[in-house]
């Protein structure tokens, strides 16, 4: 990246770890002699150049390839403006894949030009509902059976009307169902009933979960998250309700994923990491270990309840992510569909952000993943489950099918004596007779 003064800063890992990669320049004094030749002028003032170290990244090239092409497929299908995907290992925070693609309108192709996953803070929409229910459970001692009234799918606070995009239920339903169907009215009713008199209780809990803080990545350009508080000048009578469904707040995809990963990790938030170690040939110079950002974004009990709610989004027939369900492997996550320019009075010019965040498998999660796609063509589709969800499912499915599965075979008590003797005879012969491979050096394939 070149600034206005002409100074060039490398982006990505090269820029973040330049102090390891660059090495040091050498120096020696030489004298020009006849015929344009040079000779060493002095043997005392010599500084030998030193190669830079090798940086070992956490990226898994197989998962990276899967994630990149899954994202590219959906971007093309929905004619989207740009998108990103991140896959992270739950227990360690190691980034296994990260892809950022943007449409080049001149060539009508998708290329990597900007790191949206790390740098783009935006209103996340419904994926933020996880943060809302976790904050509610932590501060008001409620659980998934707490009842909210979603009425007929519409609710007005002051001059703003909140409504559900899809109507599965009406009236009083459990918080778990409201979350599963991604009810906007259910979430606004939840925070209004619990926090309307003391909204600072809600925002304070969000702040305690590190949602207003950058992750402190070594890579330049991390986006700045924003969580409003009642003390802010722009706080209004509907800010609390707007926050509950992922508006009036800003957060980057990686910051969102760090929170989802914390829920999968029992409430422990680990720092996303892209480097394993620094090496010089086979010698380890520095090793990067797991770093805990927040040892308790919520209690393990709350995390377990939240995991169950995220699982129901996919496995329940009425869940907003049920179309992603597979009987072959388990997934948990949350759909998101956010309006980008909702202040525009012309509804025909609205654009959307489609997202899906979650983890897999449900029991003992191994990987967390987030997919965010901006401005899909409205005529093709806009909903998170349709646009971004298939990227998540494709990644989870291919990782699952490519994983080495080892089955434990129990010892058999009644073993045939004849079979046992046959095996003993075979191993005895194998140990006695040695096979010699002929020397085929220098021979072509046909002769060999």
Regions found by a protein language model. Give the residues of each.
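Glycine-rich loop/hinge motif
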Residues: 416, 421-448
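Serine endopeptidase catalytic core focused on the charge-relay Asp
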Residues: 11, 15, 61-74, 185, ...
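Conserved catalytic/cofactor-binding microenvironments
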Residues: 404-422
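C-terminal, active-site-flanking charged/polar segments
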Residues: 363, 374-377, 385-402, 406-409
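Beta-lactamase-like hydrolase cores
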Residues: 62-89, 208-211
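N-terminal leader/targeting segments and the immediately adjacent pre-domain N-terminus
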Residues: 45-76, 414
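Beta-lactam-recognizing serine transpeptidase/beta-lactamase-like catalytic domain environment
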Residues: 32-46, 50, 59, 85-125, ...
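Small/polar-residue-rich segments within soluble enzyme cores
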Residues: 1-50, 371, 390
């Amino acid at each position: 990246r070149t600034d206005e003064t002409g100074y060039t800063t490398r982006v990505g890992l090269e820029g973040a770890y330049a102090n390891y990669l660059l090495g040091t320049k050498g120096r020696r004094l030489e004298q020009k002699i006849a015929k344009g030749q040079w000779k060493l002028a002095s043997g005392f003032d010599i500084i030998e150049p030193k190669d830079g170290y090798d940086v070992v990244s956490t990226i898994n090239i197989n998962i990276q390839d899967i994630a990149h092409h899954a994202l590219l497929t959906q971007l093309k299908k929905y004619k989207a403006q740009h998108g990103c995907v991140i896959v992270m290992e739950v227990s360690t925070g190691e980034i296994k894949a990260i892809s950022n693609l943007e449409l080049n309108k001149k060539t009508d192709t998708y290329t990597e030009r900007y790191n949206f996953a790390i740098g783009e803070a935006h209103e996340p929409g419904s994926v933020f509902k996880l943060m809302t229910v976790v904050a509610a459970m932590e501060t008001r001692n409620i659980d998934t059976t707490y009842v909210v009234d979603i009425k007929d799918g519409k609710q007005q606070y002051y001059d703003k009307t909140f409504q559900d995009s899809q109507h599965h239920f009406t009236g009083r339903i459990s918080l778990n169902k409201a979350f599963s169907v991604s009810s906007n009215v259910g979430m606004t009713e939840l925070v209004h009933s619990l926090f309307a008199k003391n909204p600072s209780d809600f925002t304070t809990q969000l702040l305690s979960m590190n949602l207003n803080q950058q992750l402190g990545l070594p890579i330049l350009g991390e986006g700045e998250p924003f969580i409003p508080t009642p003390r802010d000048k722009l706080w209004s009578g509907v800010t609390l309700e707007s926050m509950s469904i992922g508006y009036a707040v800003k957060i980057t995809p990686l910051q969102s994923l760090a929170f989802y990963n914390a829920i999968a990790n029992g409430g422990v938030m680990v720092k996303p990491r892209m480097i394993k170690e620094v090496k010089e040939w086979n010698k380890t110079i520095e090793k990067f270990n797991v770093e805990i950002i927040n040892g308790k974004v919520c209690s393990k009990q709350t995390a377990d309840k939240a995991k169950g709610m995220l699982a129901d989004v996919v496995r329940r027939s009425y869940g907003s992510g049920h179309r992603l369900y597979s009987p072959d492997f388990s997934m948990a996550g949350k759909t998101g569909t956010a309006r980008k320019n909702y202040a525009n009075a012309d509804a025909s010019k609205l654009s959307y952000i489609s997202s899906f965040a979650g983890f897999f498998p449900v029991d003992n999660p191994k990987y967390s993943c987030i997919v965010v796609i901006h401005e899909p063509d409205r005529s093709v589709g806009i909903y998170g489950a349709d646009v971004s969800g298939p990227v998540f499912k494709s990644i989870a499915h291919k990782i699952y099918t490519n994983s080495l599965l080892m089955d434990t075979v129990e010892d058999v008590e009644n073993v045939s004596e004849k079979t046992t003797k046959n095996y003993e005879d075979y191993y005895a012969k194998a140990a006695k007779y040695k096979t010699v491979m002929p020397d085929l050096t220098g021979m072509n394939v046909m002769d060999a």
